[in-house]
């Protein structure tokens, strides 16, 4: 909420627009960055939405396009689950896996799942454009 209230959203939106990244990729990258740094998928989703909304609101996307962008954000929010994520520890403890094994299995599975979901969202967004 601090990031949203501080007005960093519009500034970040302008900076990302200046890079020329498509909005679907921007949504994925923002959510993934927050997820990797902070660990929570929920926080990653909400933060990414708060940061990209100023840009998205100006572009008049349809409901279907917004849904596709939501899929991109959701995908980014679950990639690279590691030691700062509660799910990482739950999986490891319930399965009896070591930290190294959990990184090889859980982290890889989450990354593949999130990336695949985001790619589907990006394709859907392009088809709806």
Give residue spans per PLM region.
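Core transmembrane alpha-helical segments of multi-pass membrane transporters/permeases
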Residues: 1-8, 24
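Helix-loop-helix hairpins and the membrane-proximal interhelical loops
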Residues: 6-14, 126
């Amino acid at each position: 909420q601090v990031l949203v209230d501080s007005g960093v959203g519009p500034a970040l939106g302008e900076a990302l627009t200046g890079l020329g990244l498509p909005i679907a990729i921007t949504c994925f990258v923002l959510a993934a960055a927050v997820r990797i740094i902070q660990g929570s998928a929920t926080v990653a989703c909400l933060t990414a939405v708060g940061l990209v909304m100023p840009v998205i609101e100006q572009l008049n996307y349809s409901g279907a396009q917004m849904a596709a962008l939501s899929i991109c954000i959701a995908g980014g929010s679950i990639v690279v689950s590691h030691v700062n994520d509660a799910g990482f520890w739950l999986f490891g403890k319930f399965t009896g896996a070591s930290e190294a094994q959990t990184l090889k299995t859980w982290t890889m599975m989450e990354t593949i799942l999130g990336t695949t979901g985001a790619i589907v969202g990006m394709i859907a967004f392009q088809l709806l454009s």
